[in-house]
Amino acid sequence: MQDSSFRIVDLSVESAKAKSYDNHPIATVNDHEVRISTMTEAYHWHCHPDSDESFLALEGGLFIDFDDRTVQLLPGQMITVNRGVRHRTRPIEG
């Protein structure tokens, strides 16, 4: 029986739900949404004017393109993109 004051999220189960590109919420922390994404293609260029965005690579890894450089994020690594910074994400394979 699970206590209603918490919810255990199994990230491997959540990521297995996706057969192609997928991005869906798995939790809410205060006023922030935690999402899990399976990337099979590049996401479009964009920025977030009012909030930072953090990425945590679980498996496979990803590239994060900025206007002046590209960063490679490997499994177990995390990065926070500051608000207002234009970026796009794309999988390492693809």
Where are these regions (language model features)?
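Short strand-coil-strand connectors
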Residues: N30, D65-R69
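Conserved short histidine dyad/triad with adjacent acidic residue
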Residues: K19-S20, E33-P49
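Short, conserved beta-strand element in jelly-roll/cupin
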Residues: T38-M39, H48-D65
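A cytosolic small-molecule/anion-sensing beta-strand core signal
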Residues: N30, L58-E59, L74-P75
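Ligand-binding loop in jelly-roll beta-barrel domains
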Residues: R83-G94
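A short, N-terminal "cap"/entry segment at the start of jelly-roll beta-barrel domains
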Residues: M1-R35
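Short acidic-glycine-tyrosine-enriched beta hairpin
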Residues: D68-R83
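Short beta-turn/strand-loop junction motif enriched in small, turn-promoting residues
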Residues: E41-H44, R69, G84-R86
